[in-house]
């Protein structure tokens, strides 16, 4: 249904932006790669890439506290996001944001319970992309 809706919106001239998240429960690096392939077929105009964070007061916090979810390390989140970023940009899809905006609400004391948060996450991803294999 989602693929059909995106195609229909594009037919009517809408600019399509997609948001991709790494580190979702049950997600593997292989499933991230498969998602990127689907996104490339959809051909959005732009995309955003975010790592999943455990935020205070959310259902995910309770799942995390019960030990049923382990967030990505910062290193794994950077590597997976760099893969997504490089694939999208090589395909001509503009990536307009990588990582969450480090605002006062998000960065308030105790708001981020766990996960790969870094105020310069996007720069880490771009640096990773520029490293030699």
Name each model-derived stretch.
Residues 1-133:
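C-terminal scaffold of the Radical SAM
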């Amino acid at each position: 249904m989602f693929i059909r809706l995106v195609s229909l919106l594009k037919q009517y001239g809408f600019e399509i932006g997609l948001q991709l998240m790494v580190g979702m429960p049950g997600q593997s690096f292989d499933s991230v790669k498969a998602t990127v392939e689907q996104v490339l077929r959809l051909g959005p105009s732009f995309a955003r890439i975010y790592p999943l964070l455990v935020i205070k007061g959310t259902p995910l916090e309770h799942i995390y506290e019960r030990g049923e979810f382990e967030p990505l390390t910062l290193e794994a989140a950077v590597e997976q996001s760099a893969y997504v970023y490089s694939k999208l940009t090589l395909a001509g899809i503009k990536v307009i944001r990588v990582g969450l905006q480090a605002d006062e609400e998000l960065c308030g004391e105790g708001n981020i319970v766990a996960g790969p948060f870094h105020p310069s996450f996007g720069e880490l991803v771009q640096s990773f992309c520029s490293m030699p294999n």
